[in-house]
Swiss-Prot record:
GO molecular-function terms, A-Z: ATP binding; magnesium ion binding; phosphoribosylformylglycinamidine synthase activity
Protein keywords: ATP-binding, Cytoplasm, Ligase, Magnesium, Metal-binding, Nucleotide-binding, Purine biosynthesis
Protein name as it appears in the record: Phosphoribosylformylglycinamidine synthase subunit PurL
Binding site for substrate: 93-96, 115, 240, 312-314, 540
Reaction catalysis annotation: N(2)-formyl-N(1)-(5-phospho-beta-D-ribosyl)glycinamide + L-glutamine + ATP + H2O = 2-formamido-N(1)-(5-O-phospho-beta-D-ribosyl)acetamidine + L-glutamate + ADP + phosphate + H(+)
Residues the record lists as binding ATP: 50, 90, 500, 537
Family of the protein in this entry: Belongs to the FGAMS family.
Positions of disulphide bridges: none
One Gene Ontology term from the biological process aspect of the record: 'de novo' IMP biosynthetic process
Broadest EC class assigned to this enzyme: ligase
Pathway noted in the entry: Purine metabolism; IMP biosynthesis via de novo pathway; 5-amino-1-(5-phospho-D-ribosyl)imidazole from N(2)-formyl-N(1)-(5-phospho-D-ribosyl)glycinamide: step 1/2
Length: 748
């Protein structure tokens, strides 16, 4: 055994506390050496162990009779969608790497989440991304945004996976801490799914497959578990470098090996590299491993055991073939031009042994390293931030109401604003057509993709209003769940399951931990009420700079299922017949906490829109029921920018005119700014054929929901809005020009 010992100072340098260093000595019965310290520091980092979040995450609802792989059981969540098929999905962050090296940081985030999906035997069919950056008027923010988007596009396009949707929110709070959350959805056959476990197969050989191992990404896991500082920007060696063409080969080879049933288990090498893959597979299978690092194919000469174990070089897998199938496995990977090298053996005693140059470099119980095993678990001190009691005192009635003649320009300004304008400059860089699975155009509320070989479809969405969760963490998180579910329901699909990416500040600061805890509580309560299992996800703490934490952002990734994609809904009606429009649900708009308030007054304050989980569920149930009965021709969720922005988006997307009369709504909402631009929950604009109006009304009113007549389609290419004391009209072209102008200049 390597004799070199390490000190408490070394442990602290690796991000471990004194208590944790003492615990490691108890586990080993001795002081660890440098290789062992490196392994523990990576595996016990926040990024790998979830040590400050796991006890909170265990309060989330995870049960469903459709669940095939739940939270923490495998690399991603999996749910049964019938016909022997499963939808496999997960979301993960790559925030810190993107802040330092945006192109590679964002690209490798896409690569990592793709591997989580295809290691389970699922072929990825679509990806999404949820992005947060500072105001691109500042050169550094523009650089981070444009380079990250290019990294996402280049990697995904090279893999041949269509982008099905996503979101972008720009705000000064994210200036030094961008958030890049990547989600991938795949489809697998039940009998061709793989596991990340040794399954107790003692004596089986362990192989490393894919790319070579280099020095890139060393300390990546611990790097993602610290606040960002000026020094962080110089830690580019902690950012991995991706090769999407290598990943494409690795995906095809892995899926072929899984389909031919050659494997006992397969695990992606992501955070903490070989350290994580060997320990997690061993612990899950209640075994150990004996690994010889001299056999690992290296990209760079003279790498020591510490570097090899902690390298996060991309496009690598650890696989355990069935006995007697080793030759066939190697042949498949060689056929695809990839390494496939035996590096060890599964052992019975539960110990992870690492050797190099004939010397034992590490000897650690595998269980002691992993989440759910010996990795530490904490609940931190909580303290309610004082600002939460201040922001609710804001009185929107003290803001002067809009005059009718200022509304047209206000709509134009909002349509061209950073958070509402067209995302075309982003999705033009993404391949949205590859694979022939996309059903709806980019820019819809939710993405809808066809499951190859079937009539079924998967609806996908990512959502979170970071301003809401900043102003009210508990209810803001509930709204994030409901908004994501509404976007899936707007396609006509039934919300099915949730994956989450929780982006917060330093958990050791009590105010930050309170906000995190409240968001988790809100997320759990909303999912329980809506009957949605949380299948897994990711926690990213330390999104904080010397100026403070980012707005808390619990990003919700939602999947839904529709029985026939041909019957899916769009934002706009596709029929050539005349249609009528109505506003349905629980319309209670407020300018508090709204995008309108921020753009017009520069304020992030006030009570967020009222949330009623009962009304949300009733509204979505009625909408889906109407879709199933063929009563609707379109559906558009109300969100940022309120009613007029939603109407403008309908006109822009459908390139058809709409005539609206707001007289009925004016009696309910007398303030013009709230009526036109206030934000609300549980509300959709739906369209239908005139003959179906009675049935549509009954579907919603029978559940105690409101139905307000808005107007009808028009032969004129314009949006016409009348009411008591006003008549506004915008041509479709003028709306489109404003909508397309917001982000365009930053990407030219």
């Amino acid at each position: 055994m390597e004799k070199e010992k390490v000190s408490l100072a070394d442990a602290k340098e690796h991000g471990l506390t004194e208590t944790e260093f003492v615990e490691i000595q108890k586990i080993l019965g001795r002081i660890p050496n440098s290789t062992e310290l490196g392994i523990f520091s990576a595996m016990w980092s926040e990024h790998c162990s979830y040590k400050n979040s796991i006890l909170k995450l265990k309060t989330l609802p995870t049960k469903s009779d459709k669940l095939l792989a739940g939270a923490g059981e495998e690399n991603a969540g999996a749910m049964d969608i019938g016909d022997g098929l499963a939808v496999v999905f997960k979301i993960e962050s790559h925030n810190h790497p993107t802040a330092v090296e945006p192109y590679q940081g964002a690209a490798t985030g896409v690569g990592g989440i793709m591997r989580d999906i295809f290691t389970m035997g699922a072929r990825p069919i679509t990806s999404l991304n949820s992005l947060r950056f500072g105001d691109p008027k500042e050169p550094r923010n523009k650089y981070l945004l444009t380079r990250a988007v290019k990294g996402i596009g280049d990697y995904g396009n090279s893999l041949g996976i269509a982008v099905g949707g996503g979101e972008l929110f720009l705000h000064p709070t994210f200036t030094k801490n961008p958030l890049v959350n990547a989600m991938t959805v795949g489809i697998a056959k039940h009998d061709e799914m793989a596991s990340a476990s040794t399954k107790g197969k003692v004596g089986n050989k362990v192989y490393i497959v894919g790319a070579t191992t280099g020095r890139d990404g060393i300390h990546g896991a611990s790097f993602a578990s610290k606040d960002l500082t000026k020094e962080s920007e110089e830690k580019r060696s902690a950012v991995q470098v991706g090769d999407p063409f290598m990943e494409k080969l690795l995906m095809e080879a892995s899926l072929e090996a899984i389909q031919k049933k050659l494997l006992v288990g397969i695990q992606d090498m992501g955070a903490a590299g070989i350290s994580c893959a060997t320990s997690e597979m061993s612990a899950k299978g209640k075994t150990g491993m004996d690994v010889d690092l001299d056999k690992v194919p290296l990209r760079e000469a003279d790498m020591n055991a510490y570097e090899i174990m902690l390298s996060e070089s991309q496009e690598r897998m650890l696989v355990i073939p069935e006995v007697g199938k080793e030759g066939e496995l190697v042949s498949i990977f060689h056929k695809w031009g990839l390494n496939a090298v035996e590096i060890g053996t599964v052992t019975a005693d539960g110990i992870l042994r690492i050797r190099k140059n004939g010397t034992l470099k590490a000897e650690i119980p595998a269980e002691s390293l992993v989440l759910g095993g010996g990795a530490p678990r904490y609940v931190r001190e909580e303290k309610r931030p004082t600002y939460l009691d201040e922001v609710v005192k804001f009185d929107p009635n003290k803001i002067p109401d809009l005059k009718p003649d200022t509304v047209p320009q206000t709509l134009n300004s909002l349509l061209s604003s950073l958070n509402i304008s067209s995302r075309r400059p982003l999705y033009e860089q993404y391949d949205t057509e590859v694979g022939l699975v996309k059903v709806v155009e980019p820019g819809e509320d939710g993405g809808l993709v066809r499951i190859p070989g079937t009539k079924k479809g998967i609806a996908v969405a990512t959502d979170c209003n970071s301003r809401y969760t900043y102003l009210n963490p508990y209810e803001g998180a509930q709204i994030a769940v409901c908004e994501s579910a509404r976007n899936v329901a707007a396609t006509g699909a039934e919300p099915y399951g949730v994956t989450n990416n929780l982006n917060f500040g330093n958990p050791y600061i009590p105010e930050n931990y309170y906000v995190f805890s409240e968001c988790v509580r809100g997320l759990g309560d909303a999912c329980r009420f809506l009957g949605l299992p949380v299948t897994g996800g990711n926690v990213s703490f330390y999104n904080e700079s010397p100026e403070g934490p980012v707005f808390p952002t619990p990003t919700i990734g939602m999947v839904g299922v529709i029985d026939d994609v041909a019957k899916g809904l769009r934002t706009y009606p596709r029929t050539k017949e005349d249609v009528k429009y109505a506003l349905v649900g629980n319309f209670q708009p407020t300018i508090s906490a709204s995008e309108y308030l921020y753009r017009s007054q520069g304020l992030d304050t006030g009570a967020i829109p009222n949330i009623s989980l009962e009304k949300e569920k009733q509204t979505m149930d009625a909408l889906i029921e109407c879709r199933k009965n063929g009563l609707l021709t379109s559906a558009k969720d109300l969100s940022l920018g309120g009613l007029l922005v939603a109407l403008a988006k309908i006109v822009i997307a459908g390139k058809k005119g709409v005539e609206v009369n707001l007289n009925e709504l004016q009696t309910k909402v007398p303030r013009l700014d709230a009526l036109c631009f206030g934000e609300t929950g549980a509300s959709f604009i739906v369209s239908f054929l005139p003959n179906d109006e009675t049935k549509v009304r009954e579907s919603f009113t029978s559940k105690g929901l409101s139905v307000y007549t808005l107007g009808s389609s028009s032969a004129k290419a314009s949006l016409s809005v009348k009411g008591d004391g006003f008549h506004w009209e915008w041509t479709t072209k003028s709306l489109e020009v404003e909508f397309e102008s917001g982000l365009k200049s930053y990407f030219e």
